[in-house]
Curated annotation (Swiss-Prot):
GO aspect biological process, one term: signal transduction
Keywords: Acetylation, Isopeptide bond, Methylation, Phosphoprotein, Ubl conjugation
Lineage, broadest ranks: Eukaryota, Metazoa, Chordata, Craniata, Vertebrata
Annotated region described as Disordered, given as residue ranges: 1-117, 151-181
Protein name: 28 kDa heat- and acid-stable phosphoprotein
């Protein structure tokens, strides 16, 4: 073990915050218990105890309704903060009769991006072949320059060949003339 013990690591529990609804429910439960204890201490006179018991039963019905509502409400910080995380939504199961097989299939983000990339590449190649892109225009201009240079070189070569032929012919004529003399 290194000097000074282990490093890092989270110690302690994550904090849990109680919502205002939860605090209210706890306070009401404590008050209810206090009332019940007081009623038990006072004694159970039959005539005097009946209205209190009826009131107590009504209160307990209301508290049960409140507890049901409380269970439906979100606990902790979830009640205070609206969370809209699509990954967190539990997907409901569907019956086979409810499935829509004819509807358009939704693609994932990666698949959509891949298809868009391929389509963009195809569009670019079409425009490139038509000579409408900057790169195609530059290529065509370069090819035109090269074509002109080759034509000029071929023309010069042809002129040099003709000049050479003329020189050889004129040289032969001179020789033949000089021989004839």
């Amino acid at each position: 073990m290194p000097k000074g013990g282990r490093k890092g690591g989270h110690k302690g529990r994550a904090r849990q915050y109680t919502s205002p609804e939860e605090i209210d429910a706890q306070l009401q439960a404590e008050k209810q218990k206090a009332r019940e204890e007081e009623e038990q201490k006072e004694g159970g006179d039959g005539a005097a105890g009946d209205p209190k018991k009826e009131k107590k039963s009504l209160d307990s019905d209301e508290s049960e309704d409140e507890e049901d509502d409380y269970q439906q409400k979100r606990k902790g910080v979830e009640g205070l903060i609206d969370i809209e995380n699509p990954n967190r939504v539990a997907q409901t199961t569907k019956k086979v009769t409810q499935l829509d097989l004819d509807g358009p299939k939704e693609l994932s983000r990666r698949e959509r991006e891949e298809i868009e990339k391929q389509k963009a590449k195809e569009r670019y190649m079409k425009m490139h072949l038509a000579g409408k892109t900057e790169q195609a225009k530059a290529d065509l201009a370069r090819l035109a320059i090269i074509r002109k240079q080759r034509e000029e070189a071929a023309r010069k070569k042809e002129e040099e060949r003709k000049a050479k032929d003329d020189a050889t012919l004129s040289g032969k004529r001179m020789q033949s003339l000089s021989l004839n003399k």
